[in-house]
Design a protein with these regions (language model features):
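Active-site "cap" helix and flanking loop/linker of ATP-utilizing ligase/carboxylase catalytic domains
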Residues: 2-23, 40-112, 120, 125-127
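Short, surface-exposed charged micro-motifs
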Residues: 26
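Short acidic-glycine loop/turn motifs at beta-strand connectors
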Residues: 29-33, 126
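Activation loop entry of protein kinases
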Residues: 35-37
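A short pocket-lining beta-strand/turn micro-motif at the edge of beta-sheets
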Residues: 113-116, 135-137
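Generic C-terminus detector
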Residues: 122, 126, 132-137
């Protein structure tokens, strides 16, 4: 926090560009400590799929508090649940990946308690309920 996040945000403010919003830090942990590989002014993908379902406070309320500079006046609450995000990638990703291959086990996962399945790079096979690969991940 004090090595990367705070200096970045403080530096933006000193340059006359105070940041308000979501700032995602893509980090790599090295033998010399954490290194920034990217900044994004958005939520991280796929990390957000694990984080937002745990949020009890209305996200719009949080965003409005950020805009109005009153974030310190609201209480942000989270569930006590653990969260995990698993990303599946089609064979060959990120280079030449396969499309049109059936993905099995999705309905079994969706039937499990407290499990959410998010799709990206998938589609329903025409005329059926079969989910197939349509993108890299």
């Amino acid at each position: 926090m004090n090595e990367i996040f705070r200096p970045t945000v403080d530096g933006m403010a000193r340059m006359g560009r105070p940041f308000r919003g979501v700032l995602y830090f893509g980090l790599m942990i090295t033998k010399d400590g954490p290194k920034v590989i990217e900044y994004n002014a958005r939520f991280g993908d796929p990390e957000t799929q694990a984080v937002l379902p745990r949020l009890k406070t209305d996200l719009v309320e949080i965003m409005n508090a950020i805009i109005d500079e009153r974030l310190d006046q609201i209480q942000i609450e989270w569930t006590d649940h653990a969260a995990c995000c698993v990303v599946l990638a089609s064979g060959g990703y990120p280079k030449s990946y396969r499309k049109g291959h059936e993905i099995s086990g999705i309905s079994d996962a969706e039937a499990m308690e407290n499990v959410l399945v998010f799709h990206a790079g998938t589609k329903l096979r025409e005329g059926s309920d079969t989910v197939e690969t349509a993108g890299g991940r």
